[in-house]
């Protein structure tokens, strides 16, 4: 009962830290900018993290029970291999599914924003496009972050979460100081990229986790696709037909790659 209580407490504290992070960021933006900036940030975050986050909720429903069901200590070689396999399979599927979705969101935001809100919210377009890249990094690190929880290591989980929260606050504030609202989106993407690297290093040291070669290749391909998409959206106006032609081609490349790889994985 006590380990379960500690785990529940870790979840609650993690939620409080994330809520505190959001409050601090919004208070800073309200002080440095105005309520309009805060409103645009809230709207952009809702599109990226709430709507795209629903995909994570669906995919992770059966992952945590499977990971928790693997017995054995951190040092048990067979258990480490089994956990690595479980995490890597989930990570690979996350990246393959989220890659095309994020690419489509970034490309389609000029249409999505007026539909969900109105044309007055187009000021958050570039910020939201940059922040959306963070979803690919989240697809990578989220399955790995479950390792402390699956082992009942609530203290390590909280240390990990504390680092991530502090990093996000620093990157968002620095981004706003450098490039206004658009910089906040870039700061979010940078924070998630650093978090991914930190989680990989931490999990390698503590749990013996190793990212699979296949997962690494999937990550690199989908990241290059998103960088190509960002180059497109910042170089060509969405009012130009070339934007949509090239955008559809890039999105189809990502979708085709993911579809072929998923078919191989599920066989």
Residue ranges and their predicted role:
Residues 1-69, 134, 138-142:
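Transmembrane helical elements of multi-pass membrane transporters/channels
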Residues 1-14, 84, 88-92, 257-267:
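N-terminal membrane topogenesis motif
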Residues 2-6, 39-42, 119-129, 242:
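Juxtamembrane helix-entry segments on the extracytoplasmic side of multipass membrane proteins
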Residues 14, 18-22, 45-48, 60, ...:
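Short runs within selected transmembrane alpha-helices of multi-pass transporters and secretion channels
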Residues 36-39, 88, 122-125, 154-155, ...:
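Residues that define the loop-to-transmembrane-helix transition and helix capping
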Residues 44, 48-95, 145-150:
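Helix-loop junctions and terminal segments of transmembrane helices
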Residues 55, 59, 84-138, 169-177, ...:
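Alpha-helical transmembrane segments of multi-pass membrane transport and lipid-handling proteins
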Residues 230-267:
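Membrane-proximal transmembrane or re-entrant/amphipathic helices at the cytosolic face
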